[in-house]
Structures are given as C-alpha cells and as structure tokens.
C-alpha cells in the first residue's frame, strides 16, 4: 500500500499583504511548504501531490526541481474541492495523507503516530485540545460515560456549529489519513450547502461514520505543530516556536546556549559535547561543531565544519570553511568557501581567507587577504599582507611553505612560491619565487632630507 501525500498550497494569503504566495513565506530561511515537503519525505511518502493555485510561477521557480506532481486548483472552493483535484492521481489502494502547506511545524513523529492510528480501511484524523477553540472546526463524538472518549461521528465548522457544539474544545487540525478508494467516493458526494458556500473536506468524516467506517484520532505533542500562518504576526510566532524547538535540541545534544531565545538556526546543526554558543549567533545550511567548540556573540556560520576545541570569536563570518582542532578565527574574521584552517592555526580580526589552506600553527593576526593560497605550517603573516591572486581575467595560486615569515604590508603577486624558512621584509612586493631561507626586501631605499619645511596653512 503506497503512501500518497496531498499538500494543499493553493491559497493566496491575502492577510500577508504580499505578492508572494502564502506558502512560500519562510520559516528559518526555508519556505513553509518546503518544511512540509521535507517532513512528508521523512515519513516515507511514495508520491506527493502539490495542489497549487495563486502564484504558480513563483511556486514552480522555488520548488520546480523536486519530485512533485503539480495539481492545479483553478478556483479556491474549499479544502474538499482542493483534494478532489488530486483524485485522478490517487490509486484505490493508496493511503492518502493530507497536509497543509502553511502548517510548517508538523513533526515526523506526529505523522507517524497518525499513520499508526489508522484503522484497516478506516480513517485517522489529527486533533488537538485547545483552551480557546474559537475559529476551529470541532470534533463531534458520541456521548460516553466517565473519562472514555466517544466515537468520532463528524466535524462541525465554527460557522455551522450550534451553541452546544461551540463548547467542544477538541478541534480538527485538517490533517488526516484516508484510504484512497473511500476518499474518492466521499469527495464525489461533497456539497457546498453550508455557511461558507464551500466544499469542506471535513464533511467526509460524517460520511465515514455513516458508512460504518472506523475513525480513530491522534494528537501532536504540542499544539504549535498544527498552527498555520495567515499573517506576518503569526509567521513570526511560528518562527520563534521553531527556533525554540531547535535551540532545545542543541542543548539536549550537549551545547550550552548563553541565551536560548537569542539564536537563529536556519539549517541542520550538529554539536558535540560542551559546546558554548554565545548570543545572536546565526547558523545556516549544514554546520558541524565538535567537542568543546566556542562560538562568540554575533558570529554567522554557514555550511562549515568546526573541529574539537576550536573557537570562533565574536562577529566572524564562517562560510563553506573548515577549522581544525584548536584553530581559531576572529573577532571580525571572514572565512569564505574553500578556506581551511589546520590544527592550532589562527586567523585574527579583519582577515579574509578564500579558497586557501592555512597550515598547522600558522597565523594571520590582522588586516590581511589570503585568497587562492596554500600556506604551510608555522607561517607568520604580517598585518596588511595581500595575496594578489587576480590578474583581471584569471585567478592564480600563491604557495607559502613552512616557517616563512611575511612582514607587514607585503603584496604577493601570484603565481608565486615562497620556499621554506624565507623571510619577506615589511612593505615588499613579491613578483618572483623566493628560495629557502632567503631574506627578500623590495621596498624603496629610505631617504633623509634635512632642512625640509612642512607646508603651513595660508591665512585668508
């Protein structure tokens, strides 16, 4: 039996006040609908039907390369009508899981619990109990005694509910699992004879009860999982909830967060033990932190690997880079893609490294640019040093071998190799290879002019 996931994503989202389709608004730098798609994959979906409407070009530009079956809902006539558009792509023996593109925080474990609750040839719906259920469809059950729950007999929408039904605090989330054959039959029976004039997907629950089909329920661990975002205030609330959840995962994995409410996780972060993360740190993409790593305030880490005992000092940007054991960068350092710091290497403030390897114990303390370079072990790079790697058309490599000392304000015009043990005098411009243990100085000879007078300001 295949798992066929239907994701409803046709709404415009008028209250967002945006040209962007509602489901493309981001949580943690990823669109809401992408979160839902990713979770659908995690539960083992065999096919995903994406029901779309408004903003088709933008949706396809964002999601087009993925394995999705695009299903057009030309008119938005309700959730039942939306799912009905996907009917031709649903086999009788499919299990159909219905999700919503603007409910991004739904968890894999919750959907697995829902599918586990699915009776044979029956229906499983995801419900939640709210202290204030205003605006939501209510779960109607048969009367029962004591603490036992009655059987689900239907779902009544807020606008169609009686005064007694409005007292029910178990609400419908809209998420459900349904056998494909029965779903198609029930969808064909839907009517829009209701206060909204829409085809409610929820009406199939009453049909299932009338047909004698078993209906079971499951509930999420937290109600926030099933909340949607209809405006930017709600979007921000979901963002904070997502960040709180991700911060908790890091702490449980061994990270110490100086303030869990001041961290942004916009990707997948893996941490070792005794990691220290200061405030206002941003993680994007895939980031791995080893044991005893320290991340300073305001740092930004993007798609990088940080080994044990390494330190990222405040306000550094580390992107597509690797730091070895006990290496350090910052404060205010920038490591661009292809940068690699070996064990005990140090990159200091206002140093930029791009597509360069910095060897064991080597240091560039301040105010340097190191691009397209291979730097050996035990090298000292003086302040103001630049690898001149670009000739206006092509990039060229600078090689600095072990134990080289580069004086301040040195320009290395690539391609060039500085051999082991060489010393480059401050202010030099190096255009040719340097041999082992050589001292090279290219600056202009110093002149002393006696009797020279400094200009004075002319009084007007």
From Swiss-Prot:
Enzyme category, top tier: transferase
EC id: 2.7.7.23, 2.3.1.157
GO MF annotation terms: glucosamine-1-phosphate N-acetyltransferase activity; magnesium ion binding; UDP-N-acetylglucosamine diphosphorylase activity
Subcellular location: Cytoplasm
Region (Pyrophosphorylase): 1-232
Cofactor stoichiometry and binding remark: Binds 1 Mg(2+) ion per subunit.
Highest taxon of source: Bacteria
Sequence positions that bind UDP-N-acetyl-alpha-D-glucosamine: 8-11, 22, 73, 78-79, 100-102, 137, 157, 172, 230, 336, 354, 369, 380
Residues reported to bind Mg(2+): 102, 230
A Gene Ontology cellular-component term: membrane
Active site: 366 (proton acceptor)
Catalytic activity of the protein: alpha-D-glucosamine 1-phosphate + acetyl-CoA = N-acetyl-alpha-D-glucosamine 1-phosphate + CoA + H(+); N-acetyl-alpha-D-glucosamine 1-phosphate + UTP + H(+) = UDP-N-acetyl-alpha-D-glucosamine + diphosphate
Record Gene3D superfamilies: Hexapeptide repeat proteins (2.160.10.10), Spore Coat Polysaccharide Biosynthesis Protein SpsA, Chain A (3.90.550.10)
Sequence segments annotated as region (N-acetyltransferase): 254-460
One Pfam short name: NTP_transf_3
Cofactors: Mg(2+)
Pathway assignment: Nucleotide-sugar biosynthesis; UDP-N-acetyl-alpha-D-glucosamine biosynthesis; N-acetyl-alpha-D-glucosamine 1-phosphate from alpha-D-glucosamine 6-phosphate (route II): step 2/2; Nucleotide-sugar biosynthesis; UDP-N-acetyl-alpha-D-glucosamine biosynthesis; UDP-N-acetyl-alpha-D-glucosamine from N-acetyl-alpha-D-glucosamine 1-phosphate: step 1/1; Bacterial outer membrane biogenesis; LPS lipid A biosynthesis
Keywords: Acyltransferase, Cell shape, Cell wall biogenesis/degradation, Cytoplasm, Magnesium, Metal-binding, Multifunctional enzyme, Nucleotidyltransferase, Peptidoglycan synthesis, Repeat, Transferase
Region (Linker) location: 233-253
Annotated positions binding acetyl-CoA: 383, 389-390, 408, 426, 443
Subunit field text: Homotrimer.
Family to which the UniProt record says this protein belongs: In the N-terminal section; belongs to the N-acetylglucosamine-1-phosphate uridyltransferase family. In the C-terminal section; belongs to the transferase hexapeptide repeat family.
Function: Catalyzes the last two sequential reactions in the de novo biosynthetic pathway for UDP-N-acetylglucosamine (UDP-GlcNAc). The C-terminal domain catalyzes the transfer of acetyl group from acetyl coenzyme A to glucosamine-1-phosphate (GlcN-1-P) to produce N-acetylglucosamine-1-phosphate (GlcNAc-1-P), which is converted into UDP-GlcNAc by the transfer of uridine 5-monophosphate (from uridine 5-triphosphate), a reaction catalyzed by the N-terminal domain.
This protein's name: Bifunctional protein GlmU
Species this chain originates from: Shewanella baltica (strain OS185)
């Amino acid at each position: 039996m295949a798992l066929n996931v239907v994701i409803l994503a046709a709404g415009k989202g008028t209250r967002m006040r945006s040209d962007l389709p509602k489901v493309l608004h981001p949580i943690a730098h990823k669109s809401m609908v992408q979160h839902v798609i990713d979770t659908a994959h995690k539960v083992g979906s065999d096919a995903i039907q994406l029901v779309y409407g408004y903003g088709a070009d933008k949706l396809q530009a964002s999601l087009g390369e993925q394995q999705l079956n695009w299903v057009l809902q030309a008119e938005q006539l309700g959730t039942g009508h939306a799912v009905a558009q996907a009917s031709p792509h649903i086999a009788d023996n499919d299990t159909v899981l219905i999700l919503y593109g603007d409910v991004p925080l739904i968890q894999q474990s919750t959907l697995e619990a829902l599918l586990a609750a699915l009776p044979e040839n029956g229906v499983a719906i995801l419900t939640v109990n709210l202290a204030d259920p205003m605006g939501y469809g209510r779960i109607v059950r048969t009367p029962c005694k004591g603490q036992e729950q009655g059987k689900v007999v239907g779902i009544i929408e807020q606008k169609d509910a009686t005064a007694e039904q409005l007292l029910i605090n178990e609400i419908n989330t809209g998420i459900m699992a349904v056998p494909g054959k029965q779903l198609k039959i029930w969808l064909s029976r839907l009517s829009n004879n209701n206060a909204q004039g829409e085809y409610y997907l929820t009406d199939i629950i009453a049909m299932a009860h009338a047909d004698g089909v078993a209906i079971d329920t499951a509930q999420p661990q937290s109600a926030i999982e099933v909340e949607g975002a209809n405006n930017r205030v709600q979007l921000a609330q979901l963002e904070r909830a997502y960040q709180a959840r991700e911060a908790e995962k890091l702490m449980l994995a061994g990270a110490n967060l100086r303030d869990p409410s001041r961290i942004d996780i916009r990707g997948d972060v893996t941490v070792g033990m005794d990691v220290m993360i200061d405030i206002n740190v941003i993680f994007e993409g895939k980031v791995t932190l080893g044991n005893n790593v320290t991340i300073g305030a305001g740092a930004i880490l993007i798609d990088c690997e940080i080994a044990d005992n390494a330190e990222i000092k405040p306000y550094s940007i580390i992107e597509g880079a690797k730091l070895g054991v006990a290496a350090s960068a910052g404060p205010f350092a920038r490591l661009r893609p292809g940068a690699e710091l070996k064990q005990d290497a140090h990159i200091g403030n206002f140093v930029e490294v791009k597509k360069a390897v910095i060897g064991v114990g080597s240091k560039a303390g301040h105010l340097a640019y190191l691009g397209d370079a291979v730097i050996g072990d035990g090298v000292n790079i003086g302040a103001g040093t630049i690898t001149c790697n670009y000739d206006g058309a092509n990039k060229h490599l600078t090689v600095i071998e072990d134990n080289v000392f580069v004086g301040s304000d040195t320009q290395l015009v690539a391609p060039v190799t500085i051999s082991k043990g060489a010393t480059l005098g401050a202010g030099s411009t190096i255009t040719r290879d340097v041999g082992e243990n050589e001292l090279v100085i290219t600056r202009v000879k110093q002149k002393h002019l006696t009797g020279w007078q400094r200009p004075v300001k002319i009084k007007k």
